[in-house]
Swiss-Prot record:
Keywords: DNA replication, Plasmid, Plasmid copy control. Belongs to the IncFII RepA family. This is Replication initiation protein. It comes from Escherichia coli. This protein is essential for plasmid replication; it is involved in copy control functions. InterPro entries: Plasmid_rep_init_RepA_IncFII (IPR017837), Plasmid_replication_init_RepA (IPR003446). One of its GO terms (biological process) is DNA replication. NCBIfam families: incFII_RepA, PRK13750.1, RepA_IncFII_LM.
């Protein structure tokens, strides 16, 4: 029956997903033990018990189909690999998880779909094994990395004691403070380090996403500049810079303004003429 499923049951592009971390990536010994214990989790009695409880509460109506269970098994490997025992948080975006777990698909138009991963996460959340919360940030115009944490029910299902989890957390506190001492910084308590770890993920993502947004704006502008003459681009740059000066976003003397005009015109000419505005096209030499 398994052979038939693997041969014919192909309602998805990758019916047998496998977690494959990026080349050179490593993880903690504690996370490696979690990954070992999570192998084949959906075929165990513990998983069936959690599904039965979800059915009794009206959250689910049946055991998930075989393709969903395979997705959950692959996703659990990725979750355990990227788990941070100090912050009790999976330090990885859903998109990266979906790609590494073989649960992402890309259309002919280049749009990425991670529906299989999000559905598997939602299912684990309904079982009470993880917490899964999304949050939209209007400042950067997209969702920030999802907060995924492990619950005590998951550790119990994986036969991992609370003492082992606490020991892994203390070990990370010691390691973090050693790194701070090397940098000449004061040591911090566990609560402060946990708060710092949560802030770091969001702040790094916001700065990275802001940079990506800036690149995207430049690429879109380069597409429009492709058919424009140099003098047209000069006029547009001067108009833009005049507006920024009036709004107080650019403050400098006359010579600095001239240099900025030359810099922006040169940048826009290179991007538009060499077709560097495309993420897929190879830059011209």
């Amino acid at each position: 029956m398994t052979d038939l499923h693997q041969t014919y049951y192909r309602q998805v592009k990758n019916p047998n997903p496998v977690f494959t971390p990026r080349e050179g990536a490593g993880t903690l010994k504690f996370c490696e033990k979690l990954m070992e214990k999570a192998v084949g989790f959906t075929s165990r009695f513990d998983f069936a018990i959690h599904v039965a409880h979800a059915r009794s509460r009206g959250l689910r109506r049946r055991m998930p189909p075989v393709l969903r269970r395979r997705a959950i098994d692959a996703l659990l490997q990725g979750l355990c690999f990227h788990y941070d025992p100090l912050a009790n948080r999976v330090q990885c975006s859903i998109t990266t998880l979906a790609i590494e777990c073989g649960l992402a698909t890309e259309s002919a138009a280049g749009k990425l779909s991670i529906t299989r991963a999000t559905r598997a996460l939602t299912f684990l959340s309904e079982l009470g094994l993880i917490t899964y919360q999304t949050e939209y940030d209007p400042l950067i115009g997209c969702y920030i990395p999802t907060d995924i944490t492990f619950t005590s029910a998951l550790f119990a299902a994986l036969d991992v004691s609370e003492e082992a989890v606490a020991a892994a957390r203390r070990s990370r506190v010691v390691w973090e403070n050693k790194q701070r001492k090397k940098q000449g910084l004061d040591t911090l308590g566990m609560d402060e380090l946990i708060a710092k770890a949560w802030r770091f993920v969001r702040e790094r993502f916001r700065s990275y996403q802001t940079e990506l947004k800036s690149r995207g704006i430049k690429r879109a502008r380069a597409r429009r500049d492709a058919d424009r003459e140099r003098q047209d681009i000069v006029t547009l740059v001067k108009r833009q810079l005049t507006r920024e000066i009036a709004e107080g976003r650019f403050t400098a003397n006359r010579e600095a303004v001239k240099r900025e005009v030359e810099r922006r015109v040169k940048e826009r000419m290179i991007l538009s003429r060499n077709r560097n505005y495309s993420r897929l096209a190879t830059a011209s030499p």
